[in-house]
């Protein structure tokens, strides 16, 4: 009976952390969808400009976000070890890094964005919209990354529901601002695709204001005195933040950027294939929100238990998270396989494109199943602060296996555009195997040390 109660308690803890994260990540994805779809209604040039800008911004956003979310396992360990007094210092240094990275990103944009867009040989109007869209988004870069720093605190303390509510509030605000600035409604100027960037920048400021108010006012966070204590740069603390955060950020950057590179290789196959690839990838990205949410939840839960030296409990959370995620992944895989034509019809009515999307979705099923193993284990290893393993795994899977293999299957074996989906599946399979072996080795090592 005690075992049943402990199991139920772990299950409740896991879902209470994971489900709000899932809703949060879906809300963030929905904002990107609003940017694209509403820009598309403004015109094809506007959609092209915001898409180019979004593709440049996404790897930067994901990579920098990863560096800052490196604070999560650090805070989780301190929480488990009952060293709450040190948590405020960790978050203040994360905010410092957020400001520093934001300044570098803005400076790099000022110096190199125009040159980069010129090398892409875009139409003049598309070039202008992409450039101004990025400039508008830059208005909110600093508050966005500072919000990520505060989210690391709030989520790790188990208050993922607060973050969820913030992003659910921001979602309709972002949609309304898009409507106003893209189409020139409610007295606002008609900016087309650039308006989507303005709306995004303003939304980032709104999110940040709410995060600051919550951390400053709510009793659950007052103890950490994030904005009350004066900031003193501690090189040792900064080094810890970077030693954990940079490998996470690089791993996430490599994962995000490989899809951009694959899109460039697929572009040679023509408009129909590009459209089909983007549709299949868009749906796959939506499915990825489930393993990503399990991954983030397991980083928190495993990190707290590892910090408290309760390694057996951390192992139980690991097994539970992987098993649940795999069960959901199998269910979704069956659902996708049996409904591929209907899923394709959500994106297009063109029968030729539908046929290609159906083909790509077949490979997406395997991608989803392998990710159901790899993503949660990435989160588990980060919970143990074993971040270099996930970095090496991502580098090997995507840049040593996936890209060269994709080129081989395309140029030598003549598999066509499917070559890159096949190589993504194989690369992710190797990643899942490596991460699984690493997790078993690490957990056995920690169990031996505890004896």
Question: Which sequence ranges carry the predicted segments?
Answer:
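Small-residue hotspots at the loop-to-helix junctions and early N-terminal turns
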Residues: 44-55, 134, 197, 271-286, ...
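Short runs within selected transmembrane alpha-helices of multi-pass transporters and secretion channels
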Residues: 68, 137-155, 163-174, 196-212, ...
